[in-house]
Amino acid sequence: MDEPARLQLLRRRSTRTGWESARRTQSLTVPGDINEGSAYDTADYAITPIEAGLSSDAYLSRKRHSDDVTQRSSLIKLGIMLVFSGAVIWTLVVAVTGSQSSTDAMLAKRLVNCDPAVLAAFLPSNAVIENVTSVQQGGTFGEGKANRWVSADPTGLPALCAVIVNVTSSPSSSYRFGMFLPSSPSSSSEADDKVSSGSWNGRLLTTGNGGFGGGIGWLFMAEGARRRFAVIATDTGHNSKSTEVAWALNEPEKRTDWGWRALHGSVEIGRNLTRGFYGEQAKYSYYSGCSTGGRQGLRELQMDPEAFDGVLVGAPAWYTTHLNTYAAKTGQFINQPETPGYIPAEMFAVIGKDVVRQCDADDGVEDGIVSLPDHETCPSANPGADPTLLYTALSPGSEGQWAELYNRTEPTAYGLGYVRYFVYGDENWDWKRFDDEQLVRDAMRLDASGAEAVEYDISRFQDRGGKLIMYHGDSDGIVPVRGSNLYYDRTLEAMGEERMDGFFRYFRMPGMHHCLGTSMDAPWNIGAWGQSTAFGTNGTASVPGFEDPDHDALLALVEWVEKGRRVDKLVATTWNTWNNVSTGVRRQRPLCPWPARAVWDGDGDVNAAESWACRVDD
């Protein structure tokens, strides 16, 4: 893509209000009685809501002082421990025959360090080791059904040390975090980027959570461990399914842990444990997460720009007070037959099929994918309604995932649970009648979790060389894709287009659902958070058959951070059966940095990536 043209368009976009589009639109008609307030009422509103955020300067100042004290304490503890552990290490080393390599000797040291006594020397006073397990090559680790968020444990792991730490965060709360530490040290002094089950690559990767779920995401951590990262993940301070929110009732400290504190503390302590295990600091620190995990990554880089060198976030649920109240509102009118916006669940598939019929060819290719949902409009039955933004609407093409939010007798817990337990502290709050604007204002006033990622000027992260990649599926039926447009545009307004272009890339993914998957046979896999789990617990480390920075977003981020290779395109992949690699590749297509889009060359195979190019519309 021509860079001046891209910057020129960004400059034009920076003068627009919110996420409104200046593109030509067409009228979209939908079967059935869909009136004002429907799930994808696409009217553009132009107001600036009051922002809510958490000032962290004072906290970070105290944290740095605490780090200094903790580090001195850790060194004293380490000196005592090394008297004992050094003798054990020496015993192991002298037993090594002359034919063994120096790497084998280093491996022996790592196996000794997979010991709670050794690792405890690197913990602050409010943290304790809960479990340390040495996992053999091809083994498994996790907590099974005791983990209410993700009970499936990863299998086929590389040799590693699995660690669980419990941290007291307040007199009434605590959180846990886990680590996977690949047991074989790198034989190179430089971090390398090969995907294998071999040595540690010298990098640290933190992974995020989902919904309101509480539990350590071992299954998602395995994606990083198979790429040879040392990996961190937190349980956010509780144990629950992603749709269970009752744990938050009258528990402000637990809500704070979920909002930001558990992940932030896990990164800080996990960094020290990595140093304790390997005898050296990680050379680079990365983050990968989607949905709530996307929000967590944005929140942490805003709070502590030093935490990560590179951040990969998908479908971020960053605007908590607006997104979650939006989920309550849409659930209110879609789930009640007596309301004008009611949509019977059996109509979801009918609507989705007709959207494809009307909108598929807008990009010049009839392939079953709605690639330009922003070009469509669904006129409101009440155009005179008060144009106050609650949250951005779901897009045409997202109908395949509506049942996850709306096929029920009451609003989803993402909305109703949030309002009852985070906002009002009333488990009997009546969802059938409420004032929309007042609910949002109450959420902004009463939700003190600090979860929202609403600090748009992230210059401190950019100034230290940080890189950010954000992606979002156009067919996301849970977190509307245009919410990411909104975040991008507000950051653009706060920082300016030239600075943004140097460190921030946003990729929209036509046809992809929430974080992964598709009902349109659309290319969806870019090696991002959680995507390998579509293939089972013995998942892959990257995009199967395409383990390189052109196809894998995490590897692309590594190349950008460490080698300065700009990410101006990613190639997404899907298979003939979307989650079965053995059925063969069905399609590959380039993803383009927003606001560019992929355009077919008019001649080549539409299923081949090389037949498409990135272009910015006039």
Residue positions per predicted region:
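Cap/lid segment of the alpha/beta-hydrolase catalytic domain
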Residues: 197-201, 210-279, 325, 430-437, ...
